[in-house]
Amino acid sequence: MRKNRLGNFPSMALDVTVDNAMVFYLGGTYNEVGKPNENYGRELLELFTTGIGWYTEGDVKEAARVLTGWKASRFNDQPAPKGIYNTWFDANKHDTGAKEFLGVTIPARTVDNNTEFQVLNEEVFELIKIIFRVRPDAAARFIARKAYLYFVYSSKGDVDESFVNDLAAEFRAANFDIKPMLK
């Protein structure tokens, strides 16, 4: 998170999505083809990007399918291809079927293109980009509101909606780069 703290929010969201701590904390390690774990998919939408009301239960399920196969090793007795405390991808646990997220199709993949690099770039990053492409106003406003509540005034009852709208417009105009919004 530190790397992108004032950078591009979608890039930070991608980093957080496949971060070992997040994968482990929200049960991503148990998110596998045939039994997707919806925890992170829901949090990504509800708490990190758009807020409630901008997605369906089906979108949460499809986000969970996109995120199948990512593992986090925490202990020495667990598989750890990249060492403990590192995220890794198990292609055998990834759902290779097509996904429909926020009305956009993420194509199915074959065994040949079901690698960590390809899934990260063609599915996980695409998932993040879809949120900001399909729901740009909702995401900009939601994140600007969080910034306002953190940096300006913490009482949710006294939010200056006009100021939040200005922050959101700046954030969106800057292609979701954080620093211009905070200036």
What does each model-found stretch correspond to?
Residues M1-K183:
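Active-site substrate-binding loop specific to GH73 endo-beta-N-acetylglucosaminidase modules
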